[in-house]
Amino acid sequence: MRYHMTLITFDERNQVFHLSNKTISYIIGLEKATYLSHLYFGKAIKRYHNSRKYPLIDRSFSPNPAGLPLKTRDFSLDVIPQEMPSHGHGDFRNPAVQIKQVNGSSITDFVYDSYEIIAGKPALKRLPATYVESDSEAETLVITLVDRLLDLTLKLSYTIFADRQVIARNSFLENKGQESVIIKKIASASLDLVSQDLELISLAGRHNKEREIERQTVQRGTRIIDSKRGSSSHQANPFIALVSSKTDEFTGTAIGLTLVYSGNHEMLVERDQFEQTRVMAGINPFGFEWELAPSQ
C-alpha cells in the first residue's frame, strides 16, 4: 500500500518517505520501526527500490541502542545515517538535540511516532521563514518523534517546493510531561552523509570585506562555524556547502545549508571514524539554555 500526494509519498511496505520534484529527491527511512535514517539526497529519482540501506555490520565499540530487543550487534546508532540524532543511546557523534532533566541527566531517546503530509508550507509563529502564496507550490512532511520516558514530542518539518531545488526544515519541541526540562541544544536541521569525497565551503569575512570564500577538505573531527555576537554577522555567515572535490561554479555535486533566521548560530560539520559526515545548523548552544515547562 502506498499513500500518494504530488510531491511526497510514503511507502508503507518498505517504511520509506520520498520527497521529490522534477529536480531533487530527499529520502528518509524508518529503521526497526523506531529510528529515522537518511537514505538519499540528490538528483530526482522516480522510485526508490530499497537499494541504499546502510549495511548492517558488527562494528567494535558501536553498541546497540538499549531500547531495542536485538539479538545481534549489527545495528548501532553510532553508524546509522540519521535525521535528528540525540544523546545517550550509542551514538557518540555530536547530537542535534540535547535536553537536561531536573535530575541532571542528558539522555534522550526520540523514536518514531507518526507522520502527516500537508499541502503548502505552514507559517512559523513570530519567525521569518520561506513561504508560498498558494498551497499548490509546495508540500510539507511533518514527522513526529517522541521520548516516552520524558514525555517530550519532537516534530520535524520538511517542505519541498514544486519548482525549487530546496528542502526547508525546522524543528518543534513540546513538553507534555509533568516536569520542566532545559533545552541545551536543538538544531533546525541535521543531515548524515556517507559520501567520503567532500569539501567544505564557508563564507568568512570582516567589515568591508564580507563573504570571503573558504574551501577545505572535510577531515576527521569537528569543524564549527558560528557566531557568538548576537547576530549572524559578516564574520561568520550562516551558510555552508558540502561539495565534491571536483565541483566548481558550473558543474558538480553540492549541498548547501543556510539559516533563514539567525542570531547566535552554529554550523557544524563532523567526520567520524567511518568517514561519514554529519552536518547540522541551528541556534548556537553557547550560552543557550531554555526552560521548557510542562504544556509548552
Protein language model regions, located:
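Polysaccharide-binding surfaces and accessory modules of carbohydrate-active proteins
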Residues: 10, 15-18, 22, 26, ...
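Short, Lys/Arg-enriched N-terminal segments with co-localized hydrophobic residues
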Residues: 1-4
